[in-house]
Amino acid sequence: MLVSEFDFHLPEDLIAQEPLADRAASRMLALDRSTGAWQDRMFADLPGFLRPGDLLVLNNTRVIPARLFGRRAGLRTQPGHEATGQVEVMLTEQISEWEWRALVRPGRKVPVGESIHFGNEGLQAEIIAHGEFGERTLRFTPIPDFFHVLERVGHIPLPPYIHREDRPEDRERYQTVYNQQPGSVAAPTAGLHFTPQMLAKLQELGVQTAYITLHVGLGTFQPVRVDKVEDIRLHRERYTLSPETAAAVNAALHENRRVIAVGTTTVRTLEHCATVADGKPLVPHAGETEIFISPGYKFRIVQGLLTNFHLPQSTLLMLVSAFAGREAVLAAYRHAVEQRYRFFSYGDCMFLA
């Protein structure tokens, strides 16, 4: 199968640059997997598509202010090297408690062994390695409350298709209301529509909720660079399946209740965990996944999906196509373009079941 088979025309002005004033005011395109029929609805209508006993699984990761601006402390091995140069660092993946992979600009001017100072709260890191693909490995000097300092010093890393600088309000709006575990450099965007009021309403209707954690990396924005779907390889992302969520999913499957995933990150986590379990009940654990889901994949857990609209020829569009059929999904996307739905992170959503 060719990557080009997942292309569609998307006018630039449909890419949402700002969040709506009310995060729950998004439109929702509902797609029936069994018939391919769709309905133009609102996210507020979601309760009407769920049933008592459904298990709604959400990703409780928190986006960290991963974009840092600092100054080089000076190159120790080259006397006279400029010591005041500005450096931009984008944290991409936590390796250990104090070590991170990162993109550094201008990378060629920041060699191994040089330190970078960020702000005036004691946050500093040393470049300890160059990666194969241009990334750097940083080791931060241990400080108390690292993530709290990062919150004050760093900037929210908005996606590359949002053509503006981050603003203070993005610290709230580019987070889900139920975020708990810091570690992502991109939001699990399907969850951005939920409010505490919506979650409470679903609970009143008998819909159960559970949470996984998958820390989203910058790889989610990388374009596909191969021609064949079979040649695609995904980046690794860290996830955690808690005892409570493993038990909730096992119970739902045993009792023939639907498991509804909020977002593709939740789909990938649950389906990866099903692969690990190999036909047995899920067991709580943490690990890394690089699962790639494309048409032909047989879903083991997920029976419903809430997701935003995705990039043309992207692996996430392939996942949605695997879930509901490529032709049906692309037809729904063409309809969404005609009806001027808002696309991508701050955009509208789809419900597929």
Swiss-Prot record:
It is an enzyme of class 2 (transferase). It catalyses: 7-aminomethyl-7-carbaguanosine(34) in tRNA + S-adenosyl-L-methionine = epoxyqueuosine(34) in tRNA + adenine + L-methionine + 2 H(+). Pathway: tRNA modification; tRNA-queuosine biosynthesis. The keyword S-adenosyl-L-methionine applies. GO terms for molecular function: S-adenosylmethionine:tRNA ribosyltransferase-isomerase activity. Monomer. HAMAP family: QueA (MF_00113). PANTHER family: S-ADENOSYLMETHIONINE:TRNA RIBOSYLTRANSFERASE-ISOMERASE. This is S-adenosylmethionine:tRNA ribosyltransferase-isomerase. It comes from Acidobacterium capsulatum (strain ATCC 51196 / DSM 11244 / BCRC 80197 / JCM 7670 / NBRC 15755 / NCIMB 13165 / 161). The lineage of its organism: Bacteria, Pseudomonadati, Acidobacteriota, Terriglobia, Terriglobales.
